[in-house]
UniProtKB/Swiss-Prot annotation:
Region span, Complementarity-determining-2: 71-81
Keywords: Disulfide bond, Immunoglobulin domain, Signal
Gene that this sequence comes from: Vpreb1b
Residue segments, region Framework-2: 57-70
Family: Belongs to the immunoglobulin superfamily.
Its job: Associates with the Ig-mu chain to form a molecular complex that is expressed on the surface of pre-B-cells. This complex presumably regulates Ig gene rearrangements in the early steps of B-cell differentiation.
Organism the protein comes from: Mus musculus (Mouse)
PROSITE patterns assigned to the protein according to its UniProt record, in alphabetical order: IG_LIKE
Protein name, as recorded: Immunoglobulin omega chain
Disulfide bridge positions per record: C41-C115
Biological process per Gene Ontology, one example term: cell morphogenesis
Chain residue ranges for the region called Complementarity-determining-1: 42-56
Renumbered residue ranges of the record's region Framework-3: 82-115
Keyword match Signal: yes
Length: 142
């Protein structure tokens, strides 16, 4: 039986100011060719995945990383150029998880997959204002 190994690594996409979210991924996963695999990306508990977009990247041996997709919600997502629909994103907000599903696994899917998070622009601006307010308040107390 042929197996495709899918290695996972950590990538934290840092956006904005203030405390940054951390993402955690299992070190590896594997499945059979032709099957579907779901890779997970857990956001640190002090951040709510509901306000973040999840970005997924693939890096094949000897190649630079390539953008696969961005997922915020079913109605707010973006597939990378030339990325087939068998790559899809989803979220579990109750468990603070983002997922990359790859269906119909093929030999060329053997790669390192990176997840990253980024705030939606309006949330990023709100959090930057809050952080600047906290910083100003702290500076006044000095």
């Amino acid at each position: 039986m042929a197996w495709t190994s899918v290695l996972l690594m950590l990538l934290a996409h840092l956006t904005g100011c203030g405390p940054q979210p951390m993402v955690h991924q299992p070190p590896s996963a594997s499945s059979s060719l032709g099957a579907t695999i779901r890779l997970s990306c857990t956001l640190s508990n002090d951040h709510n995945i509901g306000i973040y977009s999840i970005y997924w990247y693939q890096q094949r041996p000897g190649h630079p990383p390539r953008f696969l997709l961005r997922y915020f919600s079913h109605s707010d997502k973006h597939q990378g150029p030339d990325i087939p629909p068998r790559f899809s994103g989803s979220k579990d907000t109750a468990r603070n998880l983002g997922y990359l599903s790859i269906s119909e696994l093929q030999p060329e899917d053997e790669a390192v997959y990176y997840c990253a998070v980024g705030l939606r622009s309006h949330e990023k601006k709100r959090m930057e204002r809050e952080w600047e307010g906290e910083k100003s308040y702290t500076d006044l107390g000095s």
